Structure formats: C-alpha cells, structure tokens
C-alpha cells in the first residue's frame, strides 16, 4: 500500500456551530480513531489537502496515510487509512472526514475497489456489461493492502460471469466477501435471447 503524508491540526472546539466556522475558513473537521488510541483525536484538515487526496485516488482506492497531527508545539504521527469522507450532495462541499489509525503490525479489514480491465468478447458480440459488487472486503497487514483489485474481463462471453471466488489473491490476503458474490457478468440483449428461442423452436418442430 502506498504511503502518503498529510499534515492536520488538533482541534479543541467540537459542535455544529464550530464546524460551520471551520468550513468557512477552508478547514474541514474530522476525527482520528483506532484500537490503540486512548481516545479519539479531533482534527482539522486543510480543504486543499483533501482535494489533493482525492486527485491521488484516495477516495476510490486504498492508500496508507501518515498523519502528522500538530498540537501547538507538539506533534503526533499516526498511520491511518481514509475511512469516510462526507460530502454535501447539493453544495458538493466537504463536511467531515474520518481516519482509522492503525499500526503496521495490525491486521485490518478494508474494502478494496474493483478495477475492470480489458474489453469483453461478450460486449463485442452485443452483450451488456452487468456490474456486481464494486469492492471486496479483505483482511491483511496495511502494507499488503492493494490500492485496487484488477479483474480482466477480456475472455468473458455472453451468459458468463466472474465471482469473487474466481479471483486469485496472494496468501497474505484473506477475502471476507462471500465467494459466490458476482463481480461482473455479460447478459444478452433482448434480441439475442429471442433469436436463440426462435432457433430452438424451429429445431423442435423438425423433430
């Protein structure tokens, strides 16, 4: 897992009224939590730094972060992953961010997004791509977590699908998503189904 460093500031004032003031100053309120922490750490993140994380794919892919938490003259460093980023759906503005603090020796359960690669044979034949699960839950050490999981659909034909169980993972990654979950499939268009049915009917009438 790639490591990205980001500086944040510890905040003492908590509540909606303070959160609004912070956001007007381009500071996004957030929290850092983790099993090894004595208590949650309430923080402020520069709006531009969050945009930078998004541009690097952190909102869609898994990356390890090194949080530099400034508290006056004191500084705390925590390894973390971006757990949740709340965005106002109307104004398209950041509201709050959650970071999950972890140790590098600690197994973590994380959702890793799926990246489809290649052009399926079934699509060239007129089939329709049907998405299943868009991310897979895995358990691994932080440095072993991939940013995404590539699924090659090149040989996928009409009527075929790929399940989680069809994917290959290294031994240091445990898959927690049910293996029978469908990742992607190619379904036939209506015309294709009718043609097959008509052909079968003609064969049956000749026997």
UniProtKB/Swiss-Prot annotation:
Superkingdom assignment: Bacteria
GO biological process terms held by the UniProt record: translation
GO cellular component annotations of the record: cytosolic large ribosomal subunit
Pfam families attached to this UniProt entry: Ribosomal_L25p (PF01386), Ribosomal_TL5_C (PF14693)
InterPro entries: Rbsml_bL25/Gln-tRNA_synth_N (IPR020056), Ribosomal_bL25/Gln-tRNA_synth (IPR011035), Ribosomal_bL25_b-dom (IPR020057), Ribosomal_bL25_C (IPR037121), Ribosomal_bL25_long (IPR001021), Ribosomal_L25_dom (IPR029751), Ribosomal_uL5_bac-type (IPR020930)
Gene3D superfamilies hit by this protein: Ribosomal protein L25, beta domain (2.170.120.20), Ribosomal Protein L25, Chain P (2.40.240.10)
Subunit description: Part of the 50S ribosomal subunit; part of the 5S rRNA/L5/L18/L25 subcomplex. Contacts the 5S rRNA. Binds to the 5S rRNA independently of L5 and L18.
Family membership noted in the UniProt record: Belongs to the bacterial ribosomal protein bL25 family. CTC subfamily.
Protein name, per record: Large ribosomal subunit protein bL25
Organism: Dictyoglomus turgidum (strain DSM 6724 / Z-1310)
Organismal lineage: Bacteria, Pseudomonadati, Dictyoglomota, Dictyoglomia, Dictyoglomales
Gene: rplY
């Amino acid at each position: 897992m790639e490591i990205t460093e980001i500086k944040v500031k510890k905040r003492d004032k908590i509540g909606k009224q303070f959160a609004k003031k912070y956001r007007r100053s381009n500071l996004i309120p957030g929290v850092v939590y983790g099993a090894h922490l004595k208590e949650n750490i309430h923080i402020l993140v520069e709006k531009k730094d969050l945009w930078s994380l998004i541009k690097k794919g952190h909102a869609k892919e898994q990356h390890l972060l090194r949080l530099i938490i400034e508290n006056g003259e004191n500084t705390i460093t925590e390894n973390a992953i971006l757990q949740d980023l709340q965005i106002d759906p109307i104004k398209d503005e950041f509201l709050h961010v959650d970071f999950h603090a972890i140790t590098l020796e600690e197994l973590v359960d994380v959702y890793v997004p799926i990246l489809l690669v290649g052009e399926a044979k079934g699509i060239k034949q007129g089939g329709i791509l049907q998405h299943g699960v868009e991310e897979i839950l895995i358990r691994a050490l932080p440095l072993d977590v991939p940013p995404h999981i590539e699924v090659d659909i090149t040989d996928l034909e009409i009527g075929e699908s790929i399940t989680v169980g069809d994917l290959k993972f290294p031994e240091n990654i445990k898959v927690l998503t049910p293996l029978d979950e469908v990742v992607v499939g190619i379904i036939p268009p209506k015309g294709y189904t009718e043609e097959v049915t008509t052909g079968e009917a003609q064969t049956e009438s000749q026997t």
